[in-house]
UniProtKB/Swiss-Prot annotation:
GO terms for cellular component: cytoplasm. Its EC number is 6.3.2.8. It catalyses: UDP-N-acetyl-alpha-D-muramate + L-alanine + ATP = UDP-N-acetyl-alpha-D-muramoyl-L-alanine + ADP + phosphate + H(+). This is UDP-N-acetylmuramate--L-alanine ligase. GO terms for molecular function: ATP binding; UDP-N-acetylmuramate-L-alanine ligase activity. The gene is murC. Pfam families: Mur_ligase, Mur_ligase_C, Mur_ligase_M. Belongs to the MurCDEF family. It comes from Aromatoleum aromaticum (strain DSM 19018 / LMG 30748 / EbN1) (Azoarcus sp. (strain EbN1)).
Amino acid sequence: MKHKVKRIHFVGIGGAGMSGIAEVLANLGFMVSGSDLGENAATRRLAALGVQVRVGHAAENVAGADAVVISTAVRNDNPEVVAARSRHVPIVPRAQMLAELMRLKHGIAIAGTHGKTTTTSLVASILAEGGMDPTFVIGGKLNAAGANARLGKGDFLVAEADESDASFLLLTPVISVITNIDADHMDTYGHDFARLKQAFVDFLQHLPFYGVAVLCEDDPHVRSIMPLVSKQVVRYGLSESANIRAENVRAEGGRMLFDVVRTNGSVSRLPIELNLPGVHNVLNALAAIAVATEVQVPDAAIIKALAEFRGVGRRFQRYGEVALRDAEGTPQGSCTLIDDYGHHPVEMAATLAAARGAFPGRRLVLAFQPHRYTRTRDCFEDFVKVLSTVDALLLAEVYAAGEAPVVAADGRSLARAIRVAGKVEPVFVEDIDEMPATVLAAVRDGDVVITMGAGSIGAVPGKLASSEELV
């Protein structure tokens, strides 16, 4: 039956989750096409691989397609979806297509509210270093590979498992990781945290009888579901009760050094030098080490992969030093520029703590764009708290991501609440296009500047770090 499917069309092909699956399918030999509202690095990469990419959505784009893949961001009234439905062309959710790919391999699925992309990238890097040539589909660009997806010849497929729309319940991996569980995407679960936790339990129950659940012992919500899991469980974390734990954790020049103690009948120790900052990344690395241990990657490969890990796009991505000049063009020193995808208060706090550890004593300037009005509303007080910890704050208007505005959950309301809290004086930037100039006007020599958010602020660091401004 599968041989009947020759051409697969993606609506919104430039998205992080969609482009990776499209690339793997193209490399498997399928004719792949897609459309998006604009070009980006992902669409250009796909076009170079021979994928037909069109800018704009139109009914004629799906002509000749045997299947149409959509993400949850695509509306039912999209002209391509309407055309596919009228022609009785199967409309396939993105997660279902990922599940089909996972059936061809031994799946390793990384779930959790925070840390999925980094952990997935670490697992893929370790397996690659161990000679296992994995297939991977990641939500961000793996810098060492220059892409967010790759078709490998090995037995394993490593992918993120997305809980935001409960689509991770479609996956059938042999190893499942849960990094943490936090209150996010609560609309999907009727604003019921118990339902969210149950979804993670159900995700683990999809493991086969020989499968393994790799769970973070340090996260209280993950720990609370462990008694409900009827599969083999490997616990990782800093806790003494973890099967795979880190000891002697210390920060050194933007890297984390620690010893891994593995307890599984016998005890073994592994010295690790992780080329990422922050204790949260130590936990991500422990999850990856747990997976690598299960699939018997040699210790030498684990050590080498973590020491040489080159990071993931928009996850504490370092752009280097940006030259500062006054109005007359006179050099005024430089600032360090970092970009991060963080958009939930918990992950933002972890990133800011990592920055403090990597650059002790330096002034921290944050340019932040909130993502979604509903998240801003639901996490309002937590946003006020975490945003008040920086030395200077440039706050953009909320990136709607298709949502209608919510009263008292916009950027101005957030800026007002932060101002009332009294720890930092925010500068509100209504137009994101004005953010680069606002940043350059606010920074001083020696500052560390972090651009952060999941929306259009992702274009800001590139404008700041243009070739003539880098030193």
